[in-house]
Curated annotation (Swiss-Prot):
Record-stated family: Belongs to the CRELD family.
Source organism per UniProt: Mus musculus
Protein name: Protein disulfide isomerase Creld2
Described purpose of this protein according to its UniProt entry: Protein disulfide isomerase. Might play a role in the unfolded protein response. May regulate transport of alpha4-beta2 neuronal acetylcholine receptor.
EGF-like domain boundaries: 134-176, 288-329
More details: Secreted under some pathological conditions such as skeletal diseases.
Localization annotation: Endoplasmic reticulum
Record's keyword terms, sorted: Calcium, Disulfide bond, EGF-like domain, Endoplasmic reticulum, Glycoprotein, Isomerase, Redox-active center, Repeat, Signal
Residue spans of the FU repeats: 191-238, 251-298
Catalysed reactions, as listed in the record: Catalyzes the rearrangement of -S-S- bonds in proteins
Length: 350
């Protein structure tokens, strides 16, 4: 029973935590390319080394040159895979003899290790500009796939269908045509350069707003150019009550009025059409009414204190007084002396 529990616990440790996204397993081509990149880096790191025995002339005469030696190959191979990288070590173990054969007898005839090992020997990858199981040429040819204006699906791998995924501004099976919002700056049978239209154009023949064939939404043709439509100048505002309209190129935005406004024409209390209760227009903008300073008392009960707050006021009995229906009545303990004056309530208590 204990063994079963231990096995189950070990299995749980191997499972990814809840919500974790499993990393995509590298393809055989990616694994091969990584191995070759590390091999080439190992060759660069050992390029200036020798046997290190102190008698280089004797060593090279007796053991052959370090440059082509098995000792150098061993040093390179030892640095190819981290001990924890199972897939790399598995690939290296399976293909160790192939790498040794290339090092010993094939390197001069096939100096490009990636092409010899990954493309022709393992058949895991294709050369750039080709794709699929048989390494066919990408659309537009292997030299400039997709006319240089896109990516070939599966380029350099044994996968994909060779179709073009065009860069922004380009379309068509060879990425040679321009999409809406772009115009042809330069074009021949194999090359195409598409450049962006002015922002006012949906389609165009050149870079300015006078070159528009169709105006973009939010723009209108005036004489020979597309110009911005000011939606905020319409007789009826496109915004709801409590908002004002701001025009932007090709569109508009609705912004909230200041909190003191009932309707507004722009930002801030100076642009209110009317003021909310408790505020009045003063020097062109809505300001708080101090009800406590008005000639007519705001607080009606006897002994009651008035405190102004933004947009309103509060009536509070002083310390030492208690509320009744029509007055603030002093309690026996609440007699006020000059040494013990009443204090106004804090802002938090209002």
């Amino acid at each position: 029973m204990h063994l079963l529990l231990a096995a189950a616990f070990g299995l749980l440790l191997l499972l990814p935590p809840p919500g974790a996204v499993a990393s995509r397993k590298p393809t055989m081509c990616q694994r091969c390319r990584t191995l070759v990149d590390k091999f080439n880096q190992g060759m660069a790191n050992t390029a200036r080394k020798n046997f290190g025995g102190g008698n280089t002339a004797w060593e090279e005469k007796t053991l052959s040159k370090y440059e082509f030696s098995e000792i150098r190959l061993l040093e390179i191979m030892e640095g190819l895979c981290d001990s924890s990288d199972f897939e790399c070590n598995q690939l290296l173990e399976q293909q160790e003899e192939q790498l040794e054969a290339w090092w010993q007898t094939l390197k001069k005839e096939h100096p490009n290790l990636f092409e010899w090992f990954c493309v022709h020997t393992l058949k895991a990858c294709c050369l750039p500009g080709t794709y699929g199981p048989d390494c066919q040429e990408c659309q537009g040819g292997s030299e400039r796939p997709c006319s240089g204006n896109g990516y070939c699906s599966g380029d350099g791998s044994r996968q994909g269908d060779g179709s073009c995924q065009c860069h922004t501004g380009y379309k068509g099976p060879l990425c040679i045509d321009c999409t809406d919002g772009f115009f042809s700056l330069q074009r021949n049978e194999t090359h195409s350069i598409c450049s962006a239209c002015d922002e006012s154009c949906k389609t165009c023949s050149g870079p300015s707003n006078k070159d528009c064939i169709q105006c973009e939404v939010g723009w209108a043709r005036v004489e020979d150019a597309c110009v911005d439509v000011d939606e905020c100048a319409a007789e009826t505002s496109p915004c709801s009550d409590g908002q004002y309209c701001e025009n932007v190129n090709g569109s508009y935005t609705c912004e909230d009025c200041d909190s003191t406004c009932v309707g507004c024409t722009g930002k801030g209390p100076a642009n209110c059409k009317e003021c909310i209760a408790g505020y009045t227009k003063e020097s062109g903008q809505c300001t708080d009414i101090d009800e406590c300073s008005l000639e007519e008392k705001a607080c009606k009960r006897k002994n009651e204190n008035c405190y102004n707050v933004p947009g309103s006021f509060v009536c509070v009995c002083p310390e030492g007084f208690e509320e009744t229906e029509d007055a603030c009545v002093q309690t026996a303990e609440g007699k006020v002396t000059e040494e013990n004056p009443t204090q106004p309530p804090s802002r938090e208590d209002l």
